[in-house]
Amino acid sequence: MFFDNLPPSDAIVLFDGTDFSNWVTWGDKEPQWIINDDGSMTVVNGKGSIFTKESFGSVQLHIEWKAGTKAISKHKDQSRSNSGVFLQRNYEIQILDSYENPTYVNGQAGSVYKQHIPLVNASRKPGDWQSYDIIFNAPVFKNKKLEKPGFFTVFHNGILIQNHVEIFGTTTNVGQPKYSAHGDAPIMLQDHCCIPLSFRNIWVRKLE
């Protein structure tokens, strides 16, 4: 299941390389990222993160990404290609060029950002396509209180790197993560910084 890049029959294709019809940026505006001739899209720094128009609960998400190579010798740590995929706009799996690029362990590629380090660094070199297959079990809230936490299982290039780990709350760079009650919400791809990276072949399956 995790090694076939073609979406299964019950998948919702979020990006097929032709347009941004399933995405918006801040203010429900058209994304200003670039669609390339090879069917990928590239982040344009400063143009804002993008969000799916549809909201989701628990899902299986497939996404492919490629770290950029421009001026790579001048960048290290978190200043290489750096982004993130956020489930329900709150819970981040880090996207980072972590190939021969040391950084803090819970901020490397495949980390549940600032919460769980990956079991292994499965990164390929910049310029090579990589894949994440993410199983996201959404948190459950009742009367605005947490009834059941969320969980992540993640495969990076087909290798298990997060094994049903508990999500402690909304991703935060500083301080302790906390939950705030919410319902289904969009998937977000982050416009963060540094060397632009690309995405392709994004699809999702609802698990509830």
Q: What name fits each language-model region?
A:
Residues 1-208:
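Carbohydrate-interacting regions of secretory-pathway proteins
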